[in-house]
Structure formats: structure tokens, C-alpha cells
């Protein structure tokens, strides 16, 4: 059975506009509190205007167009507008500076960029660099633009185009819709090639996983350039005719008030959001929400999980995946049995195994690499852009993907995440998980944030170093820190060194960028 058939993203939006028409599709709140709202038909019209503008400016099927934007409705106009004419969106992390952005532009040979005033200084020099492939800049601005070759005023020019699509490029669900670069926390990012089929199946899969309904209001503050916002929030919500509330920025002080304000029924969070929300003063109405599920990503310590559930009266729904899997293919479902700290079980379309370094399946309870099986270009990514070597290493011909995550499986088929392979420390013959140590250290009442890495050790392969951020106003001596560790973990897991810091470098999804600590 094929639930997608030939329905690419253009057909999806035309159908959504017809079926849901005036129902609210997107509510956007800026960092200043300004709210913009679009019905399904209005959003489709803006998508068509953007598509017409891009086509009029010479963008054709297969062209790579970079988007460097904070969360905003224009991201959605461009994302789906490009898809409607067969062009390929290349979202760029909004935190990236010149060198990081230029590397992606050069690597994928993007001739076009859509950006805002905030980021235009990154791209203006590229327009005049004869070695850069960039030839045209679409600038989202409320300022009057001076006439400059290669710069297009996106808002004013888009408004000149009709709300119906002018050009219907032949499309296939197998066409590339997006190249999404991985975070590159330990190495240069790789371009994950994502098809129309990938994005359509993400909508169906994640809406099934969350049991989404037409009357749901899904609030997200995850970056639109990230796979979570796209494939765990937006597309699932749209696949059932629900409403997306997109916030421009995360604010610990405002986040729970926004959940109450918009009467959100589903939201998603990373541990940093949960921790900072829990640090806010208790509000008498904070339990008067309508949240049915909170999608939870990455690792949350037991004490944090229990405290959040008790205080906020929420239910956490675990979802585990990566950009290459498109969705959180291992996870919990509403109403199903849950077994914390399990990350859940694989859903339909997928299989999962634990394998050793010889690529052989291991018995239940034994830690190894989590490998998952799907179909390339459909339920898994198609390939790494211009990296056949990396594709061959990660993706086997029969559809098994090596995730680089370590974990184990229990007798009932529940999977447990241990750590990323790059976060496993080899110490005196023992494999030590950074996350395990981090969770223990995070349980100290004076510690707000922590990261652990391995550092070279001539005798024991690697030593363990901890980077610790204290709760505001608290103090903790090195002696007290080591005493706590010695009391709460095996001797070989106790860090050899600690460094106290004001903050930790994190990427958009909350992962610590550990290469910046080494």
C-alpha cells in the first residue's frame, strides 16, 4: 500500500486549500509579540505568489535556493513555493556566520538566497565575489531598497504576482525537495537529500505517531530550518488539517504563557527548554493548559522528567530520530505502554536492530549501534549531497542505516538510547557514556548545565573532563564536585578534570557543540 501515490507537495497544498479553505493553518508570533495569521487558502495563495516570483526570476526545476531566515511566515511561503516549481530548498542555520554559510553556498552551488536584513551582511560580499556561485539575493525587508544589481525586494515583488500558480512544472514525488545540512557538531556538515516523498510520508507518519486531529493546535518554537519543525510539527499538522503556532524565538519567561494563550494541544521541547521553564516562578494557572502531548527530544534526566510531569501536569511523548531518518521513527504513541527511560519502539514502515562492530545483530540487553531499516528516498533520506563515500558508509543497499547512536533493546522490543558513538569515551578498556555521566552530574542541585568529553590520556586511552555551568548565585568547589561524583558513580566514570563555565556552546536543537570544548 502506498499512501503517497503521486501526490507531491504542490498537489498537497492545492488539496489542503480546497478542503480546509478558511480554517487557520498558521499563526505566527514575532519576538516583539506581533501576531500574523493565515488560513489554509491564504497560505496557499502566498505560497503561489512566492512560486510565481521565483519562476519569473529564472529559478527552475532542480535549482538550489538557500533560505537563511529566523522563524517567520515567509519561510513557509518560500519552502513550499520552491517545491511547487520543482526547485530545491537549502535551509541554513540562522546562527551561522559568513564562513559557515559560504561553505554551504559553495558546496551545493546555490545561485540564489532568500534572507532578511539581519543576515544580508553575510551575503552582500558573496554577490560581488567572482568565486562565489551566488548571483541573486531575495531580501525580506521593510526598508526601501536602493537599486542594486542582484538584489530583489522579496515582499514588494511577491505582491505583484497573482495568487494562482502561473507555471506547472512536471513534478514527481521522487524529486528532491530539500538539502538539509546536518549540524556538524563533531565535523563538517553533510547535505541530507530529502525528496517530496520523504516530506509527505513525514506528515503521515508523525501525525499517526502523535495521534493528531483536525482540531489540534500544535505550538512549536523549533527553528523552521530544522527537521523537527518541518517533519515533526508542520507537515504532520498540515496532513490532518490542524493549526501550527510558530514562535519566532524561545523565551523561558513567555513560553508557558504562550501555550496557555493559544490553547495549544501539542508542543515539542528539548531539555534546555524544559529546564529553563522549570526555573520560572510557579504561576497559579500554569496547570490550566490543554496540552495533550509534549514531544520530548534528546536526553532528560529522571529527576527533571519527574519534576516536570508533577509541576506542569504534562505527558511526555518520546521521539528518537535524526535528519537522515526524516522522522522520530522510534518512539512512544499516545495510549501505548511506556517504559522510561526507553525511547520507545519503531513504528510502521521501519525496522530497528542493535548491531556490533562486525555489523552483526546482538542479543537483547547488549549495547551496540542502533541500525534502522527503511527505503531510501521514501522513509529514509535519499543520499548525502555529493558525498557518495559517506552515503555508502551510512546506508546499506538493502535499506539499513547506521545511525551512529549506541543503545540496546529489551525483551519486549523497547529500545534504549545510551549515547552517540562519538560521545563514547574509551577509558582503561571500559566504554563510558558521556550522557550517563552528564545525567548524574545534572542531578546536583547547584548545577544547571553540564557537558562531558574525552581527552587524551597516555595510560588509560582517554580521561574524562566535565564542563559545568552553575545555577545563578551558587558556588561549588572542585573538591565538592569530585566528592559528589565519587559518591554517585563507579570509580572509572569519575571525571579527572572539571572546568566551570558561564555557558555551553549549543546548536539550534540544543545539542552541545563538543568540538568547541576540545
From Swiss-Prot:
It catalyses: 4-(trimethylamino)butanoate + ATP + CoA = 4-(trimethylamino)butanoyl-CoA + AMP + diphosphate; crotonobetaine + ATP + CoA = crotonobetainyl-CoA + AMP + diphosphate; (R)-carnitine + ATP + CoA = (R)-carnitinyl-CoA + AMP + diphosphate. GO terms for biological process: carnitine metabolic process. The keyword Ligase applies. It is an enzyme of class 6 (ligase). Belongs to the ATP-dependent AMP-binding enzyme family. CDD domains: FACL_DitJ_like. SUPFAM superfamilies: Acetyl-CoA synthetase-like. Its EC number is 6.2.1.48. Pathway: Amine and polyamine metabolism; carnitine metabolism. Keywords: Ligase. Signal peptide: none annotated. One of its GO terms (molecular function) is acid-thiol ligase activity. The keyword Ligase applies. It comes from Proteus sp. (strain LE138). The gene is caiC. Catalyzes the transfer of CoA to carnitine, generating the initial carnitinyl-CoA needed for the CaiB reaction cycle. Also has activity toward crotonobetaine and gamma-butyrobetaine. PROSITE patterns: AMP_BINDING. This is Crotonobetaine/carnitine--CoA ligase.
